[in-house]
């Protein structure tokens, strides 16, 4: 067993005595050794270790990517009632990661995670409600779950709320409420919120602040979002926006910018 800074647990009693600092110390240690340690704890039955190991297998952190093994560990954690495992099992079923896509099962896992208080579960369940994917479409219920997640500080949910007010879906159209929600999402680090907040700032003549937020978008945005945002910015009436849009497009991988 490779060296890790935290002694290897031998049984459930040892697992129960691990502190949050112990977990963080292992996570921050040498990736390969951390994977070995985490797998041992997962095999002892730790739902936390099962969820972390699943994520590492999904990402290829310290080990080869293996979506099927990742899914199996997420499912083990989920069946123990562990909310992170439930949410990730839902993501696997939604996105066909290591298993066949099944939006109905995904919605069930998200719903359980949401009812247990996980903000990411609330957000993912709301997304399915909004899209009518795996559940009957219900924007009112979707907005309710976005609000619950936003109350917990979930930035992506704040941005979603902004769109509801911007478009006037199940709530009266309210640009001030949309502006506030996009601002909350932007300050929370959501790149979509930053992009939309920048647009509304520009509409209000606050160009310097708009540009400052817009420059943050490429730092966290996915390549596909940078493509969409860059193309949109090239159509802007503001020269500075067009410049940032071109910079976004120039930074894309060649296969995405063809």
Indicate residue ranges for each PLM-predicted region.
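Terminal, low-structured helical/coil segments at or just beyond the last alpha-helical repeat
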Residues: 3-6, 219-258
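Hydrophobic face of amphipathic alpha-helices that form TPR/SEL1-like repeat modules
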Residues: 19-21, 52-59, 88-95, 122-131, ...
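Short helix-capping/linker turns of helical repeat alpha-solenoids
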Residues: 30, 43-46, 59-61, 66, ...
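TPR alpha-solenoid repeat register
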Residues: 49, 85, 121, 157, ...
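Alpha-helical linker/edge segments of TPR/alpha-solenoid repeat scaffolds
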Residues: 98, 134, 170, 206-207, ...
């Amino acid at each position: 067993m490779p060296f890790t800074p935290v002694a290897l647990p031998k049984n459930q009693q040892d697992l129960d005595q691990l502190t949050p600092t112990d977990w963080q110390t292992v996570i921050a240690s040498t990736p390969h050794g951390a994977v070995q340690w985490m797998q041992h704890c997962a095999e002892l039955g730790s739902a936390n270790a099962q969820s972390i190991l699943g994520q590492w297998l999904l990402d290829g952190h310290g080990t080869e990517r293996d979506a099927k093994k990742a899914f199996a560990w997420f499912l083990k954690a989920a069946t123990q009632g562990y909310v992170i495992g439930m949410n990730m099992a839902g993501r696997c079923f939604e996105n066909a990661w290591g298993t066949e896509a099944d939006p109905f099962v995904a919605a069930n896992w998200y719903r359980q995670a949401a009812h247990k208080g996980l903000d990411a579960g609330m957000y993912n369940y709301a997304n399915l409600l909004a899209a009518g994917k795996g559940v009957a479409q219900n924007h009112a219920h979707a907005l309710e779950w976005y609000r619950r997640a936003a109350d917990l500080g979930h930035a992506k949910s704040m941005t979603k709320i902004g769109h509801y007010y911007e478009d006037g879906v199940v709530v009266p159209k309210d640009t001030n409420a949309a502006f506030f929600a996009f601002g909350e999402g932007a300050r929370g680090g959501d790149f979509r919120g930053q992009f939309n907040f920048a647009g509304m700032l520009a509409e209000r003549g606050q160009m310097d602040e708009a540009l400052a937020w817009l420059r943050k978008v490429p730092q966290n945005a996915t390549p596909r979002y940078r493509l969409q945002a860059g193309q949109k910015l090239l159509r802007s009436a503001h020269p500075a926006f067009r410049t940032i849009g071109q910079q976004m497009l120039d930074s894309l991988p060649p296969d995405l910018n063809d």
